[in-house]
From Swiss-Prot:
GO terms for biological process: cell division; cell wall organization; peptidoglycan biosynthetic process; regulation of cell shape. InterPro entries: Mur-like_cat_sf (IPR036565), Mur_ligase_C (IPR004101), Mur_ligase_C_dom_sf (IPR036615), Mur_ligase_cen (IPR013221), MurD (IPR005762). Keywords: ATP-binding, Cell cycle, Cell division, Cell shape, Cell wall biogenesis/degradation, Cytoplasm, Ligase, Nucleotide-binding, Peptidoglycan synthesis. This is UDP-N-acetylmuramoylalanine--D-glutamate ligase. Pathway: Cell wall biogenesis; peptidoglycan biosynthesis. Cell wall formation. Catalyzes the addition of glutamate to the nucleotide precursor UDP-N-acetylmuramoyl-L-alanine (UMA). One of its GO terms (molecular function) is ATP binding.
Amino acid sequence: MKVIDQFKNKKVLVLGLAKSGESAARLLDKLGAIVTVNDGKPFEDNPAAQCLLEEGIKVITGGHPLELLDEEFALMVKNPGIPYNNPMIEKALAKGIPVLTEVELAYLISEAPIIGITGSNGKTTTTTMIGEVLTAAGQHGLLSGNIGYPASQVAQIATDKNTLVMELSSFQLMGVQEFHPEIAVITNLMPTHIDYHGLFEEYVAAKWNIQNKMAAADFLVLNFNQDLAKDLASKTEATVVPFSTLEKVDGAYLEDGQLYFRGEVVMAANEIGVPGSHNVENALATIAVAKLRGVDNQTIKETLSAFGGVKHRLQFVDDIKGVKFYNDSKSTNILATQKALSGFDNSKVVLIAGGLDRGNEFDELVPDITGLKKMVILGQSAERVKRAADKAGVAYVEATDIADATRKAYELATQGDVVLLSPANASWDMYANFEVRGDLFIDTVAELKE
């Protein structure tokens, strides 16, 4: 990693632990900062805080005392999940203390070139695809960021022989200042996380931070299926490289079943290793990045053909007596479920849907669920999802939880059918996160096979 001295002997407050806060605290300590960690979880139930204290880092746990900010901190590094209306953050900003996320730290120390990927849907799959293609080409892609590996931790081991491939959420991008990727990708922009950002425009502005420091020598890969992306293309200093499944563009595009980059066929769409129209978009974004990094077509084709997907993202789980089970628990909004369904014959699909009720109706989903074999509906949003099913003329049963839903879906399916968990809702009404929900689906499928 680059050795920098801008934090040496500076007092820094790390607000919130989890993986990113723990990594940031250790990195700042290594860089000579005087670090204080503040986390809301009580010390006795906080293994991360206990470890940091043993390493000589000051920790304050069990709450967020505002008087802590009476100390003269030069910087706050916050956990990305903590909203900006948190009183600690509001007070820090009022005092003129910069508030960053650990993504900024990763950029400052990274010896490796950075490719940043953000968007509403497809981030993790696209990040993983890019990482695998670059690694196959000898460019040693290291995945980090929102994909589960703290960017500031991975950046410490990255050299100029690596490429840092970073999945970035809107929460993370709100806390960057100098962050400057060589290539950035925005997969798409949909109205999600409005409960955090308040307005869609604020959400878009957070995502747009990814390109703030980019210049003409840098590349911004945008999804020209969206008019919004076309509008944004004129507002960046970066060189825009578009991708599209709807039209021929000066970048990566789909035409007559083939994936092209600037007029040259790279591979056929049906050769991609994972189904769904959304994965065609993910593959096109990957192709654009790979070609910009000089990767040959054969390597791209071989890697994307062998790509097995990402856990909880249209993940093939198992086949039981001719019934295939797919785990798409990451589909926490309508668009994601629409794209998941596009990869299957509706007449052979038993869809499991429903979850956290955010107050939105599901009328947009009606054309996509029309013709489904059956639905299994659960969660807080069940009544709203049932109304959409009624409008689509789809028969359904209700379930109490994911295990019950999986068993009922299997009972409704016959040989040649697909049981698809693609909830179109967040998981928080029943489960801590979409991973827990998806893992329970996987576990229940395993029980059914016994």
